[in-house]
Amino acid sequence: MNIMILVYISCENKAQAEKIGAILIKERLAACVQITQPVTSMFLWPPKEHTVTSVDETLLVVKTLETKWEQLDELVRKNHTYDTPEIVAIPATHVSIKYLEWLTEELT
């Protein structure tokens, strides 16, 4: 059974999100991507200090199959400007059968 996952990737800007998204689609590691901007990320920086930093980023949401995860993760890390990019996969527990069929066809 094919398991769909949604992969969230924070990018430095829209150009980076578009570049990574296009590569993922061309390599058949993503059937579809969505790009949302701006998203505001908040975190402690430098790490383990008490200064809260807020930055605008671009969110790349990737629709793919769980079987593509390792290749996708490697490709994103190679093409991302961050030392530690956010690459988080969430399983889609309920997906319409037609959409899952389309997604699977696009990725095989």
What are these regions (language model features)?
Residues 1-108:
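Positively charged, small/polar-rich N-terminal and surface patches that mediate targeting and assembly
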